[in-house]
Amino acid sequence: MLLTLLFLATVTAQPAPAPQAKPAAPPPAKAADVETCLACHSDRTMAVTLPSGETRSLYVDLETFRSSVHGTKIGCTDCHQDMMTVPHEARPFKSLREFTVAYYEQCKRCHFDNYTKTLDSVHYQATARGDRMAPVCVDCHGAHDVKPPQKPKSQMSTTCAKCHEGVFTVYKKSVHGRFLEQTNDVPGCTDCHRSHDVAGPRNIAWQRRTPELCRTCHENKTLMDKYNLSTAVAQTYVADFHGMTASLHETDPNRTVSVVALCTDCHGVHDIAKVNEPGSRVLRANLVKTCAQCHPGVSDNFPGAWMSHYEPSWKKAPLVYGVQLFYNILIPFMIGGLVLQMLLHFWRVVVNR
Amino acid sequence: MTTYLIRFSLRQRVEHTLVMSFFLILSVTGLPQKYFDASWARWLINFMGGIDHIRQFHRFAGVSFTLLTAWHLMFAMGAVAAGRSPLSIVPNRQDFDDAIQMMRYYLGRTDQAAKFGRFDYRQKFEYWGLVLGAVVVISTGLILYFPILFTRFFPGELIPAAKVAHSNEGLMAFLVVILWHIYNAHLNPDVFPFDKTIFTGKISLERMHHEHPLELERIKQVRDIEET
């Protein structure tokens, strides 16, 4: 009887996602499902010991589940499909990790697009290599307690920090990381690395897109005005040697590697600093060292060859501006004069005939 | 019976062919670098094997052009020093007078076209324009080739300034050649479709009479020339 009810409950639960159902009043069918399971699983002492010696609590806190994103939308057996019979069949899991990994594919039944994205990720590459510690859905999102990932935004990054603690510590001190808790304006981990299809740091295609990544914010006028930052950084980069080469390598169909300074090569990656703070790599005092990463043995004058993202003007780079102005006047004057001379000559020749 | 004169020596003809080839290579590999953001430039760059290849071609042609220029100037200076050069390419007062007279002639203010010697003022202008332009592109090109070396002695701003000068000078040279030189050597009704003198070295007496009468007279004083 109980089982029939449960079965009916699961089937009838599938269609008709009640539009804007009040969170306080979950669909009764789901409630039935959850209640059925919780008849046993509300027991706090319920646990199972795995062959690895690890203990897995089988207690489910109703309030935690109810307040999760799934709390009012799906029931226990939507994910735990293999738990339809009571008592449940014996499970072959030897360790906790084995159990978690086994549930990896459950999420794709609803979240198929995000699941397929994970197949392109560096995390999945590790899973495919047989690395059982590589994260699967629930490692980041949680299981019974799945929360909206971006509320607050900093949660995304603190989630990554669970494994990537070293990088996160460096990032937290950076000009972006320092303000992670205060504002949504600064990029967190996933803004650059992506989330489901997260790219590995040695993924060349993704590395080459670095200027594009930085541009998404640093060319956004509203955002940059708020912090009194220039939006010409990408454009001035592309106008110079490094940016020109990088942009041409990007459209070169025959090229797989590109050795040229990208934004992060000068500004740093996770430790990116405000340009004028003492530790900044692009501070005039540190610039020779920064250039020397690629151009060993350069003199103190060498960094001056880079106009620091400025457009040439009388104030900044007067020599460059002067030369440009000279040619802006000379070329039209020269070409205009020659064309006039040609036309006069031609006209005279025609008239003479 | 003489129907033509030898106007250019073999050395001059070879120099012209070389400078023409280098100029073409330098333009084709240089201009797409100046306008790399344009779609035609991107296409051309990818077509020629990518930016790194193009830079190598450009430097190779640039070094060749530098050697040719050095050779030409050394030869010319040697000839001047030995007193063997008639200095006929050096601009003088007469060229300004000629230019003004030709302007008046074109505008119909006088019926008398100026009479030219071995080189007319336009040819002198083009020659010295090339020499001067060569000095600019070669020096700035070397700065761009060896920025680390140059910034040991000069401020860093020299590098972007050299880039601006190099690319603009190159553009101007390209435009002058495309418009002015192509007109004078090809489209000019007097020589259309092709003035072959710089390749064969020969010029007809008729053209000498028409274009360089003073030079013809000078030659007649030292050599016996029968005109047909």
What are these regions (language model features)?
Chain A
Residues 10-353:
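Short sequence/structural segments immediately N-terminal
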Residues 1-10:
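Bacterial N-terminal signal peptides
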